[in-house]
Every structure is written in C-alpha cells, then in structure tokens.
Amino acid sequence: AADSFDYVRAQDVLEHVQDFFGVMEELHRVCRDGAEILVRMPFMSSLHFATDPTHRRAGTSATFDYFDPTRPLGRYAYSPARFERVSFHYGRFYPGKVGKLFKLIDRVLVPYCERNATSYEHYFAYVYPMHDVTYTLRAIKR
C-alpha cells in the first residue's frame, strides 16, 4: 500500500534490478514522507561488481543525486521520485593479516576519500578501490 513504510533497507539489491527507475519510483510510492531508505551496492571500481554477471550497475557518491532536487544532477528529473541523499559511505574489507594492515590505512584514507569524493572517483578509484557504497536516503513527498 502507498505511504506504508518509515524505513526500507535495500542491501545488495538495486545492482541486480533491470528497471532501476521503476524500482525507485515504487520505493517512493510505498514510503511515507521522510521515510529513511538504506541502500548498499557495489562501488564502481569493485572487483565484486565486475565479477558477478548478475550485476547490472554499480554506485558512486552521486548515483542518487539524480533523485535529489537540491543537487545539481537533480535538475535532469529522470523520474518523479524524489529522495534527499542524506549520506553516503564507502566500504572496504579484506580478510586476514593483510586486512588488519589495510584497516589501519583505511581509518585515514576512507574518510578523506568521502570528503573529496569527486576527485577520488575521477582519479584514484581504481588505484585505491572501495568494495561498496552505502547511502542513506530520505523520501520527499511534499
């Protein structure tokens, strides 16, 4: 039913759907105004994105800016669905001893990359790749 949900979690889902805009419009329809949507999907330079043949798309810091009327890409209005992009965070993970070393480095570099996302994504995304990106969105209905 329309306007039914205050919270939706779409973890490792949207990269698989064929009709991305249709799914976003359906999310918008079933969410109440101000509902929080948590989305996780593979980052564009992730080996996990490229390895899985069922992945249709990957995310960047700006993937959901097309739905946010307060952001420059929102002017394209590809869809009537509107969401505020509240936040995004890159995710990296490595197992074992190498993972412990990377975790120390990541404490500094990941927040730096998030603060400088456009430059990072243009110049360094394939040098220092993230695995996924997580977004917090808020449904806008007014």
Question: What is the predicted function of each stretch?
Answer:
Residues 1-8:
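A short acidic, Gly/Pro-enriched loop at the edge of an enzyme's catalytic core
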Residues 18-22, 26-28, 36-142:
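S-adenosyl-L-methionine-dependent methyltransferase catalytic module, highlighting the catalytic core
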Residues 9-16:
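Short catalytic micro-motifs in class I SAM-dependent methyltransferases
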